[in-house]
Each structure stands twice: as C-alpha cells, then as structure tokens.
Amino acid sequence: MRFTLSCIGRMKAGADRDLLDRYLDRARKSGRGLGITGVLLNEMPESRAQRAEDRKAEEAGGILASLQSGARLVVLDENGRNMSSAAFSRTLETWKNDSVPEIVFAIGGADGHGGEALARADLKLALGAMTWPHQIARILLAEQIYRAMTIQSGHPYHRV
C-alpha cells in the first residue's frame, strides 16, 4: 500500500516546505516496516477558470484522473468527519489489511472540492472546526500520517 497526498497548488520552498518534507520522510521510513511502499506528494496546478464551480470541477477532474483502480479517496473538507489520531490510524490500518493498494488524500484548491470528488470520496476528513491555510493543512496531514505509522508500530512518538 502507498499513500499519496494530492494537492492543488504548489508549495514554495521555505520553512513550511521543509517541515512537510520532514514529516513525509518520517512517514516513509516508519511505514516500511508496516508494508507501506511509498508516501508521495502530487502537486497539481490550480485551475485558471473564471467561475469557482468551473475551477472546482476542473481540479476535481485532475484528482480523480490520478486514482488507480481500488484506491481509497480521502478528501479534506471543512464539513468532513473529525477523527482522533488513534481512529485515523485504525482506519488506515483497516484499509491496509483489506489490501487497498493506495490511499489518496486530496487537498482541494482555494474554492474547495468539486462535487464529483466529494461524491467519490471514501472518507471526508476535517482537521478540526477551524479553517487552515492549505500549506498548514498539508503539514498537519503529513504529521498525522506519520503519527498513524508510529501508533501502528508501537513507537513512543504518540503518547496519550
């Protein structure tokens, strides 16, 4: 199984990008012993369409076109489900045990996700009730993926 963060827009070099890369690298290393074959970042261009609905539809099309057969799609959405780190880890572990080949975590553009992506989602996930900048949402998600790996492996990073 592999994890892919599919994000609309590109993250510039700097402290935020360094922190994102650090958590992705930690997740890669921690996941190897758990059968995770990769933790990838897929940055897609923002739509240039004039209308928000057209931008969302175009961006959703890009995310959906990249899904392989059997993949699970997790969309980050402000109206999504709030989960504890332990529950998030259990969900990932269940999908791994079900031989899901890939989990794609989608972070939409400034206008959010298009209806097609929301309808296809296997899980709509919120990172709490607050709205986060997309760069911080990427970092939070990468950290939670790493944390899930440490929970599954019994590493002391996650303390209750």
Explain the meaning of each model-derived region.
Residues 91, 103-116:
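Short glycine-rich, acidic/polar surface loops and turns
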Residues 2-6, 40, 104:
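A structural signal for isolated positions on well-ordered beta-strands in alpha/beta enzyme cores
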Residues 35-103:
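S-adenosyl-L-methionine/SAH cofactor-binding core of RNA-modifying enzymes
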Residues 97-106, 126-134:
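Short, acidic/small-residue loops that bind anionic groups at enzyme active sites
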Residues 7-9, 75-77, 106:
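Acidic beta-strand-to-loop metal/phosphate-binding motif
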Residues 111, 115-159:
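Structured adenosyl-cofactor binding patch, chiefly the S-adenosyl-L-methionine
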Residues 1-31:
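N-terminal beta1-alpha1 ligand-phosphate binding loop
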Residues 11, 78-81, 109-112:
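Short glycine-rich anion-binding loops that position phosphate/pyrophosphate groups of nucleotides
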